[in-house]
Each structure stands twice: as C-alpha cells, then as structure tokens.
Amino acid sequence: MTQFFEGNGAVATVGEQAVSDLIFGVDSASPANVMLQNNLSMLEWVTRNKVYPVFWGRNLNGDGCLTAQEITYLYLAGCKIAAIYVPDGERNTEEKGAQDAAAALKLAEDLCIPRDAAIFTETNDTETTAYLKGYAQG
C-alpha cells in the first residue's frame, strides 16, 4: 500500500511503514502551466491523484525558464516556487560564485521574486568550496 498526503505533517504510508512530515515537491524542466495532450496542465497532472507539491522547482535561466505568468499560476494554486539558477562555465573560484549569485539575483528581481526568497543553484561534482562560498555570500 502506498499513500501520500500534503507535506503539512500528515502521516503517509509507504508500503507498511509510516512516514511523518513528508514533503513532496517537483523539479521540472517544463512549466507548471503548460497544457499537456490530456488537456491538463502539468500541475493538474501531478495533482490528479491528490498529491499536492509544497514547492515547484524551476530554472531562472536557460531554455523554457520560469516566467511571470507561471509564477502567478503557481501562486494562485497555492504552490511555492523553488527558483534555481543554472550556472555556466567553470565553477571553481569565489569570484565566479559571487558573479553567478549576482546574475541569479538580477533574474529573480526581473521576475519580482522577493529579495528574501531563497535562490538555489544547480550543482554537480565540479563546484569547489570557494565557488559555493562565493555564491552563498553573493
């Protein structure tokens, strides 16, 4: 038996094991408001089985990135947004981390994302501690 509920402290069952404080979110390359072939939006398709994401992760930059219209759509649906910046080039100096943080902040400001909102960065195995420090402090 598998059951999932909202991430508001409700108990979910996975197999026979109870899981409390389950937080479900989505990280998608596709906009939440894109219409699919079944005439549902991506968000509607995700929630069709009563699984409601607490957050929807979307890239601030790159192809098909987050838009103001999608922000409004998610806001009206009661879903928080995890804004993700995807850096390019080498990620090995504190200066580059600070530059990427500044670029991420500019993109967020352009979308009217509040200044106190967290902006995540996509990471892989090439970032250095110095880069991440620069990004966090930037």
Question: Model-derived features: where do they sit?
Answer:
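Non-catalytic propeptide/linker segments at domain boundaries
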Residues: 1, 5-13
